[in-house]
């Protein structure tokens, strides 16, 4: 989607900048997009307060930096359009999840800081550098869970690189550090004919999948320190 903003207040005597054209793209390069988070008022503020000089003298690096500073802008490219225009191509962040309680993760697995009150999964990791790994694993976990129509509410990656998932039902799945996708797939494979029966009254509180030939479950009313085991020696 192309937006054009006229600039009546920017009138240097020679080569005045009269128009800014905004093109919105997504991560695949598609340009048939609309602004979702950035407002026209924010763009006009940049045009009237951040762009210095005329069509020829304005510093394109400074203009790009002004757009990048907008909280929801992930990337921006600017170029002159003869004789009095400026073309700006922007890509907005697309929020995938909350990162803890103070930031967001976009679909690239990048952490950015914007405050929103939206229901999104929560990612927790030992450091921001791990956000991309958590985002990638979220996609894999979601595909595995799709057959039983359960969504992820929270993913926790510990400093020891152990994985834990909380589902939208409230059930916590302990996956450990090894064979995490195999363990989750095993949970899905037995869900309909085994685990779902235990879920008839209330969702399970906890399922420990770190056993090579079984798993342990905790019912909501059971004391947390005494899980009921289905067999096997717990792995890591």
Model regions: which residues?
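Charged, solvent-exposed interaction patches on well-folded alpha/beta domains
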Residues: 1-54, 58-69, 75-236
